[in-house]
């Protein structure tokens, strides 16, 4: 037989590097989609909590006009959640400081519960003034970071997210893109940065946990190959 016939024309297998890159791209898309829907869900849940205070971001006549309604707020929150959740583990890898504090799903679920509780407190508890509300929510938000994160990168990103998100929100309100239903605008501004900070920490923890699961899957596949 000829030498060319000794080689079986079986299916070619991709090398471990190509397989790893493909897996990372697919897992990145999956993580982004999961984070997006989590952000949309939390936006709707937190909006229902704020309705109790009549401070919802959604005007009551949603179907009246596309421009006067805030139907796009949940998708925007979902997109921001996806970006934040993907950014946290990326920053950890870039800084060479992998986040190893309380890396289990039970801790992540408790973090989400505390975040929802902080929002519920801002909507349910009556404070004497806006300064007291701001200080209380700031303490709760920092406590959330200390309990479930404790990383310098997480704190820095949380502060940056709170600043940028609050700035964008106020610009949209001042330009009339949407409006708060509460007449007390100072009340809204007193809790908004703290909620954004806590939300950034929460989505960062979810993103880190999803990224850790991805690393386990890729490690198992490379070990099998």
UniProtKB/Swiss-Prot annotation:
Q: Which family does it belong to?
A: Belongs to the INSIG family.
In what way is this protein post-translationally modified?
Answer: Phosphorylation at Ser-151 by PCK1 reduces binding to oxysterol, disrupting the interaction between INSIG2 and SCAP, thereby promoting nuclear translocation of SREBP proteins (SREBF1/SREBP1 or SREBF2/SREBP2) and subsequent transcription of downstream lipogenesis-related genes.
- Lumenal side, ranges: 52-70, 127-129, 176-189
Pfam families listed in its UniProt record: INSIG (PF07281)
Q: Show the cross-link location (Glycyl cysteine thioester (Cys-Gly) (interchain with G-Cter in ubiquitin)).
A: 215
- List GO terms (cellular component aspect): SREBP-SCAP-Insig complex
Q: How does it assemble?
A: Interacts with SCAP; interaction is direct and only takes place in the presence of sterols; it prevents interaction between SCAP and the coat protein complex II (COPII). Associates with the SCAP-SREBP complex (composed of SCAP and SREBF1/SREBP1 or SREBF2/SREBP2); association is mediated via its interaction with SCAP and only takes place in the presence of sterols. Interacts with RNF139. Interacts with RNF145.
Its primary localisation, in coarse terms, equals endoplasmic reticulum
The UniProt site entry described as Required for the recognition of 25-hydroxycholesterol is assigned to 115
Q: Where is this motif: KxHxx?
A: 219-225
Q: Which residues carry this modification: Cysteine sulfenic acid (-SOH)?
A: 215
What is written about domains in the entry's comments? Binds oxysterols in a pocket within their transmembrane domains and interacts with SCAP via transmembrane domains 3 and 4.
Protein location:
Endoplasmic reticulum membrane
Q: What is this protein called?
A: Insulin-induced gene 2 protein
**Which is an annotated GO molecular function term of this record?**
oxysterol binding
Keywords assigned by UniProt, alphabetized: Cholesterol metabolism, Endoplasmic reticulum, Lipid metabolism, Lipid-binding, Membrane, Oxidation, Phosphoprotein, Steroid metabolism, Sterol metabolism, Thioester bond, Transmembrane, Transmembrane helix, Ubl conjugation
Q: Residue ranges, Cytoplasmic compartment?
A: 1-28, 89-103, 149-153, 208-225
Carries keyword GTP-binding? no
Annotated TM spans: 29-51, 71-88, 104-126, 130-148, 154-175, 190-207
Function statement: Oxysterol-binding protein that mediates feedback control of cholesterol synthesis by controlling both endoplasmic reticulum to Golgi transport of SCAP and degradation of HMGCR. Acts as a negative regulator of cholesterol biosynthesis by mediating the retention of the SCAP-SREBP complex in the endoplasmic reticulum, thereby blocking the processing of sterol regulatory element-binding proteins (SREBPs) SREBF1/SREBP1 and SREBF2/SREBP2.
Q: Which GO terms describe its biological process?
A: cellular response to insulin stimulus; cholesterol biosynthetic process; SREBP signaling pathway; SREBP-SCAP complex retention in endoplasmic reticulum
> What membrane topology is given?
Multi-pass membrane protein
Report the residues modified as Phosphoserine.
Answer: 151
């Amino acid at each position: 037989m000829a030498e060319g016939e000794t080689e079986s024309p079986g299916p070619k297998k991709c090398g471990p590097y190509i397989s790893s890159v493909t897996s990372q791209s697919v897992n990145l898309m999956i993580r982004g989609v999961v984070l997006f829907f989590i952000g949309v869900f939390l936006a709707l849940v937190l909006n229902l909590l704020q309705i109790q205070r009549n401070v919802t971001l959604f005007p009551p006549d949603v179907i009246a006009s596309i421009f006067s309604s805030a139907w796009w707020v949940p998708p925007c929150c979902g997109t921001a959640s996806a970006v934040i959740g993907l950014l946290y583990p990326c920053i950890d890898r870039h800084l060479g400081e992998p986040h190893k504090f309380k890396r289990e799903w039970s801790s992540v679920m408790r973090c989400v519960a505390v975040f929802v509780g902080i929002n519920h407190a801002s909507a349910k508890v009556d404070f004497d003034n806006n300064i007291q509300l701001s200080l209380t929510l700031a303490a709760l938000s920092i406590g959330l970071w200390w309990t479930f994160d404790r990383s310098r990168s997480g704190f820095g990103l949380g502060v940056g997210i709170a600043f940028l998100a609050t700035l964008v929100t106020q610009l949209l309100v001042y330009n009339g893109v949407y409006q708060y239903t509460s007449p007390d605008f100072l009340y809204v501004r007193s809790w908004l940065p703290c909620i954004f900070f806590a939300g950034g920490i929460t989505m960062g923890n979810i993103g880190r946990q999803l990224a850790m699961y991805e690393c386990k899957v890729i490690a198992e596949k490379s070990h099998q190959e």
